[in-house]
């Protein structure tokens, strides 16, 4: 099992951002051609132009590297805009979430977290929960603005909304298309709006 400690202190020099970027880019590039199980730190290091020791020193394992690469990508794309209209914000996040999860990187992470409980726990803690909290804040804003029913169970409502995305990608192996996302969002909004 992996020891995925998010508060790790790394000995030695701080990470070189150019090398970090090269390693993450190499990881994403190689995942287009190789299954995660067949991807090695040696291959990533060669593609990135760094030593294997650099990768092991910074991440400890390819699973840790995979998760951090996914998080880095998701942090750029799967972001709530608390100022946007409610429906637009949910749609943007669902579209971006679908794209990220359906990418070679996302599919590799899905495979890895289904096989590694520690990695799943880290995914939940570092990706899923922060976005769920942001979505809950968005619902709270809708309630405060008088747009959404005050008596909704936000956890259940968010499970209903995002469950379709995760179900399709994790279990059916397909991403939702824009038309399906629109249908889901329309039904979702009808159920929670005043």
Language-model features: where?
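Basic, helix-initiating cap at the start of DNA-binding domains
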Residues: 1-34, 38-47, 64
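C-terminal peripheral helix-coil segments that are non-catalytic and often amphipathic
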Residues: 1-8, 92, 99, 133-141, ...
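Short hydrophobic/aromatic patch on the recognition helix
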Residues: 49-59
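Tryptophan-centric aromatic hotspots in well-structured domains and transmembrane helices
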Residues: 58-59, 127, 166-167
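Amphipathic alpha-helical segments used for helix-helix packing
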Residues: 69-70, 101-122
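Short, basic, alpha-helical segments at the C-terminal edge of helix-turn-helix-like DNA-binding modules
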Residues: 70-77
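Hydrophobic alpha-helical connector segments
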Residues: 78-104, 157
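Amphipathic alpha-helical packing segments from all-alpha helical-bundle domains
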Residues: 100, 104, 120-145, 155-156
């Amino acid at each position: 099992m992996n020891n995925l400690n998010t508060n790790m202190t790394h000995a030695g020099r701080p990470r070189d951002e150019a090398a970090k970027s090269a390693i993450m880019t190499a990881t994403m590039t190689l995942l287009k051609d190789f299954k995660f199980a067949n991807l090695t730190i040696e291959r990533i290091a060669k593609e990135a132009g760094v030593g294997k020791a650099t990768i092991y020193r910074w991440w400890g394992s390819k699973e840790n590297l995979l998760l951090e690469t996914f998080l880095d990508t998701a942090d750029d794309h799967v972001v709530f805009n608390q100022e946007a209209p409610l429906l637009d914000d949910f749609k943007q996040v669902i579209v971006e979430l679908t794209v990220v999860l359906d990418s070679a990187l996302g599919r590799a992470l899905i495979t890895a977290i289904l096989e590694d409980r520690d990695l799943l726990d880290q995914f939940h803690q570092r990706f899923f929960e922060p976005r769920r909290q942001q979505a809950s804040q968005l619902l709270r804003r809708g309630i405060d603005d008088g747009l959404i029913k005050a008596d909704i169970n936000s956890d259940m409502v968010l499970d209903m909304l995002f469950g379709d995305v995760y179900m399709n990608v994790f279990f059916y192996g397909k991403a939702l298309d824009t038309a399906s996302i629109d249908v889901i969002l329309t039904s979702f909004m009808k159920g929670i709006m005043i």
